[in-house]
Structures are given as C-alpha cells and as structure tokens.
C-alpha cells in the first residue's frame, strides 16, 4: 500500500512538475488540493494521509490529534506559524520547512515597492486610467 501525501499549498508544482514527479516516482499517492480548498474540507481529509505539504491553511492542535497516520508535515514556505509545533513533537510528527527559498523573490518585491513609492507609480497609473496626465515628482533611489 502506497503512502498518501496531501498537498494544500496553492503554489506547489506551479512552476515545474518535477516535485510532483519525484513524489509519484517514489511511489507516493499524491492529492493536490490547493485551489478553492477551505479549512473544513482540509480538516475532514487530513486524517487519511501519511504526509502533508501545507501552505497557509491552519493546522490546529485538535485536528492534529485526529491524524494517527500522519508522520511528517512540510511547510511549503518559510514560516511555521500555522502549525502547532509542540503538539506535532508530542505526537511524533516531524515538521520541516524551506527557509530562505523565497529570499530573492522577497528582495525583488521589496525593491519594486521602493521604486513604486519613490516614483509615485501607483498614483500616476491611476491618473492615466482616469484620463488625466499630470506630472508627479519622485525621488531617486540610490545608496
């Protein structure tokens, strides 16, 4: 009997099928439930799974207690604030995450937001869509 993996992260496998191919190639039965997936459905499904790759869904202590088959929770992201770590440890469920994997994307977004503020991009975009053409004086980003 194959091990069952539930994936609730909306972005898991979006850029490449390689992560899914690795799991299925290793004999795992994979269920993807990222899009249009609510908390109640998650709580009803999870007791049947051996492994969980979780996104932003909350994984309350009470739900974790109803998961006798669950052996590992992997957070598809950096933060672990939606997983009750002490309860997982008590139940012998391993927990892991992927810290730092989004650091380039965070830096890119931060720089983009800095440019948007410095150059009034949001305001000037709105003005153009409203049919107005006005000049907004921005500041240089340097240093």
Stretch-by-stretch model annotation:
Residues 1-96:
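An N-terminal-biased, well-structured beta-alpha scaffold segment characteristic
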Residues 91, 99-143:
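Phosphate-binding beta-alpha-beta segment of Rossmann-like dinucleotide-binding domains, i.e.
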């Amino acid at each position: 009997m194959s091990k069952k993996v539930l994936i609730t992260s909306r972005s898991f496998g979006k850029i490449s099928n390689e992560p899914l191919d690795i799991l299925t190639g290793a004999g795992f039965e994979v269920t993807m439930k990222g899009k249009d997936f609510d908390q109640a459905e998650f709580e009803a499904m999870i007791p049947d799974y051996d492994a969980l790759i979780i996104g932003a869904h909350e994984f309350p202590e009470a739900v974790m207690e109803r998961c006798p088959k669950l052996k590992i929770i992997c957070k598809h992201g950096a933060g672990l604030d939606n997983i009750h770590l002490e309860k997982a440890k008590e139940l012998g469920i391993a927990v892991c995450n992927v810290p730092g994997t989004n650091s380039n994307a965070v830096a890119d977004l931060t720089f983009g937001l800095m440019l948007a503020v410095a150059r009034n991009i949001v305001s000037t975009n709105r003005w153009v869509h409203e049919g107005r053409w006005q000049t907004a004086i921005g500041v240089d980003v340097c240093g």
